[in-house]
């Protein structure tokens, strides 16, 4: 879609449904994380959001099957971009990735020494296109949405998300953003997103990582899904 300055009327253009070729959603991890879309991964602090994404990144870097997939669902190794402000790469991120058996040549980081990365930073698109990345992880949302964006303002958050939505759509890259949940209890994960509810609306898929009641295995977690099939949810245990 062409962007026009607000003071210049836009030319009317229409397209008929008959002129649109329907296509199926492609999945990075069925039925949780689609290709070419923005996914929001939520959870309380310490519930394993970063560990989950690094484990998935390690499997993808080798072309190995993801959890709950059939053994014959392996694919080509993928390049993953991982950005985080919560853990250092040298003593936490890379050791975790290595311990999960990942290919270090396929996990890359955009350097933020001179300038912090934000949703609208052109370096994101440049890195995705240059290295043919299939997954970009931004951990956590509050560090990358931008200092000038109020997370409680729907207009501001939607504008920031639109940058990432465009990159995902244009390149086919999956973008996963991690976020801490608010303190509300006994409610849908949709309503535990920190900030404006429009954040949940902007994401195409929403996952919530929660602890299970299995005291014999405290490392067990549930990824709960509320996504392309809005209103439905699925829980499966993972390590």
Report residues per predicted region:
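Conserved inter-motif catalytic segment of the P-loop NTP-binding fold
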Residues: 4-9, 24, 28, 45-47, ...
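Short gly/ser/thr-rich secondary-structure transition/capping motifs
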Residues: 20-26, 118, 187-191
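Pre-Walker A adenine-sensing motif
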Residues: 21-33, 67-68
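Phosphate-binding/switch region of NTP-binding enzymes
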Residues: 40-41, 46-51, 75, 80-83, ...
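Hydrophobic positions on the alpha1 helix immediately C-terminal to the Walker A/P-loop
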Residues: 52, 56
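Post-Walker A helix-loop "phosphate-sensing" segment adjacent to the P-loop in P-loop NTPases
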Residues: 59-77
